[in-house]
Amino acid sequence: MTSFTGIWVPIVTPFKNGEVDLPAAQKLADELINQRIHGLVVCGTTGEAAALDEIEQAALLAAINEVSGHRCPVAMGISGSSTRTVAEKVKRFNRHAPAAYLLSAPSYVRPSQQGILWHFQAVAAQTDTPIIIYNIPARTGVNIDAATIAALAQDERFTAVKESSGQLSQVKDILDSSRLSLLCGDDALLLSTLMLGGHGAISAAAHIRPDLFVHLYELVQAGRNEEAAELFNALLPLIRLLFSEPNPGPVKAALAMQGKLRETLRLPMTPMSAAGKDKLAPVLQEVMDLQVETNSAALLAGRAKFIQDVYGSTASF
């Protein structure tokens, strides 16, 4: 059974000549998995899902599933304004066997909390696949209140929440009122969320030096909070720059600087500005040069326990 903890990466969608570049996506996914991330999400906000048609989304999910094998769970982002349309899409995507659906509140229409509750329940009725509740009010126009999340948590199909409200008070309310794994969706609040008892993150910034984000998570799990804070402070300037312009422009700029993909986005999303890239380049280099000790006995023991809990084996990967 998939464990919705640790560092998950909402993988960007590479493009070539205007089309989805599946080989580049697979190569990037393989590199991320080899850095010991705990999960991937395709067709999330960072993956420009709104600019992909359903055929492209299905092909991307299949390609990432193929390269991940059993090394890493792959969740699928699902969003839309119409409950019927979203439910029908989930029903079609069940055959592609994602590890979970990352499901946001209906965008633009701004339903009541009752409407949000019924929306999630109606979509969940179409699948046995676990659902991660995605709260991102800055994009949907509506917050999913902690009480609504607690009500949804009564249904076993809801297993986690990606919390992107930017409010630590809501993080605490969710942790106090539901059984769900809480995954931080605001990278600038990653350390604070983990310190409050959060279970991990779905982190766009973790495209860059994913090993350091995994190490940060492991440090907190091992109770080495001072070291975790020191590492997070070293990552924070990069995190801020990666969200200084609309996501995923800066993330793709950073990956392009490393030669990992073309810096191409689909309209209406645009590449990072030249001024932004001038600021990003030296900070990116500092993070790429950062060296930390990641193989202490305590961390290795914690890593082995995580692998045992999730995969039923103490073999590393």
Predicted regions and their residues:
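Flexible, active-site-adjacent loop/turn segments at secondary-structure boundaries
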Residues: 2, 10-13, 50, 106-107, ...
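Catalytic alpha/beta core domains of metabolic enzymes, predominantly
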Residues: 122-126, 137-243
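Short glycine-rich loop/turn motifs that provide flexible caps or phosphate-binding loops at active sites
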Residues: 5, 38, 43-46, 76-79, ...
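Active-site beta->alpha loop and helix N-cap motifs at the rims of alpha/beta catalytic domains
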Residues: 2-141, 151, 294
